[in-house]
């Protein structure tokens, strides 16, 4: 998993919402720093049953208290440049060998998402 935001990024959290109602936080970075471009791994494998949803929540700070805020009086919009903002979470999955990658993932309407597969996707 990775967290990618720009200079106004404040925090990001990944949560699994299981079909039985259980919620499990799998990554929580409460003090994001633009200078950190890290990938995070899990200590233990998590079995994710069909119907589980991944929710990623992030916040941004354009206040005078953020030393990276160039002009707190201006609105910030999404974009590719560092002075613009983005929320680009990434997660890699290892699929059970009996799961068809084409049906393992669905995205919410209106959301932009990418599903990556590779020859290493077979589970042990």
PLM regions: where:
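His-enriched metal-coordination microenvironments in redox/metal-binding proteins
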Residues: 1-102, 110-124
């Amino acid at each position: 998993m990775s967290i990618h935001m720009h200079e106004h990024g404040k925090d990001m959290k990944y949560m699994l919402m299981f079909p039985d109602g259980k919620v499990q936080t799998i990554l929580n970075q409460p003090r994001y720093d633009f200078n950190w471009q890290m990938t995070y791994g899990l200590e233990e494998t998590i079995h994710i049953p069909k119907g589980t949803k991944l929710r990623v929540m992030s916040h941004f700070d354009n206040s005078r208290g953020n030393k990276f805020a160039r002009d707190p009086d201006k609105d910030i919009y999404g974009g590719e440049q560092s002075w613009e903002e983005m929320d680009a979470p990434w997660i890699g999955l290892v699929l059970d060998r009996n799961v068809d990658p084409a049906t393992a993932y669905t995205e919410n309407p209106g959301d932009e998402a990418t599903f990556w597969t590779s020859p290493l996707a077979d589970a042990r």
